[in-house]
C-alpha cells in the first residue's frame, strides 16, 4: 500500500504542476484514488458522470490511501421486526400530497439553488423559515434548529434536532441535500432541481411535519435523538455533508443510523413502480432494516440497485465511521435523466411516489427512535 500511496501522491503533484495559476481542489474519486484539479476540471468530471468527495478542507483525514485506515463502521443490532405499526400507520394516513406539491412548487421557483449563488442562499433561508414554522409549537428543550455554516460558501446546511428523552447520545439521522445544479453553466443557467433534490427535501419536510403533528405535539418524545439534515453543496462533491459528519466524528457523536433521501419523485414506468435500495457503499445491516420498513409500510416493492462511489450524502456518513443507507426513486438505470438541467421540473414527478418515500422516513424515525438494543 505504501508504493500505491507514493504513486497517488506523484499523480497529485503532476496535476498540480499542470495548473500553476488556478486554485486547486483535492478530490477523492475512489477508495484509493485521489486527484488535485482546478475548479473548472471538477465541473468537467461531474459532466462525465464521475462522482467524488471534495476533501480539500479535509486532507488530513485522507486515508493515505489505504482503505483499512478509514474509520470502521460499527455493526449495530437493528430491530428484527416492527413494533410501532399503529403509530406509524396513524401518521402515514395523514400524508398531505397537496402540501408537498405547494412546498416543491415554491422550492423549484428559485432560479437555482446552486450553493455558490445568492439564489442558493435565498432558498436555504426559505427552507429554514418553513421548517421553523412547521415546528414552531415545539419547545426548545425538545427541538432545535441549527444553521450549520460553511466557510467557503454562503448556503448553509440545516439541522433539525429532536433531543431524545432517555438516550440522547444515540442519534438517528434523516438526510437530504437542498442544493441544485445546472451542469452546463452552473453560475448562469436555471436549475429548478425538482427531482434532484427538491423531491427528497420535500419528502423529508413532510415527514418532519407529520412527526411534529402526530408525535411531538401529543407530548411524545423519542428515546433516542432524531435529526433531520438538509445539506448544502452536495453537488459540489458532498461538501456540506462532509463538513457535518467530519465535525460529528471529531465530537465523537454516536450516530446509530443515517438514511439519505435523494431523488424520490420520478417514475419511469407506472406499471413497474418501485423504490431502489442502494446496496453498494452502504451499511448492510441498516440496509436490511430499511427493507423491513419498506415491506411493512409501503404499497410498492423495493429493488436492490447500485449507485457507485461518493454517490450521495450517506457516503459522508460511512466515510466518517457512521452507518449509512440510501433509498432512491427506482433502480438506478431507471432514474430521472432530466436532472442537472432546466428540464428537472415538477410536472415530471409523482407526488404519490414521493409519499411512499415519506412513509419510509416515518417508519425509520419512529421505529429507531424508541430502539435501545443496539
UniProtKB/Swiss-Prot annotation:
Superkingdom of origin organism: Eukaryota
PANTHER family per record: AMINOPEPTIDASE YDR415C-RELATED, METALLOPEPTIDASE M28 FAMILY MEMBER
Protein name: Probable aminopeptidase YDR415C
Residues binding Zn(2+) 2, per UniProt: 196, 235, 340
Alphabetized Pfam families for the sequence: Peptidase_M28
GO cellular component, one term: fungal-type vacuole
Signal peptide: 1-18
Species whose genome carries this gene: Saccharomyces cerevisiae (strain ATCC 204508 / S288c)
EC numbers on record: 3.4.11.-
Cofactor(s) the protein requires to work: Zn(2+)
Keyword Magnesium among record annotations: no
InterPro entries named in the record: M28_fam, Peptidase_M28
Organism placement in taxonomy: Eukaryota, Fungi, Dikarya, Ascomycota, Saccharomycotina
Similarity remark: Belongs to the peptidase M28 family. M28E subfamily.
Enzyme class at the top of the EC tree: hydrolase
Cofactor notes: Binds 2 Zn(2+) ions per subunit.
GO molecular function: aminopeptidase activity; metal ion binding; metalloexopeptidase activity
Single biological process term from Gene Ontology: proteolysis
Alphabetized UniProt keyword annotations: Aminopeptidase, Hydrolase, Metal-binding, Protease, Signal, Zinc
Binding site for Zn(2+) 1: 177, 196, 262
CDD domains to which the protein is assigned, alphabetical: M28_AAP
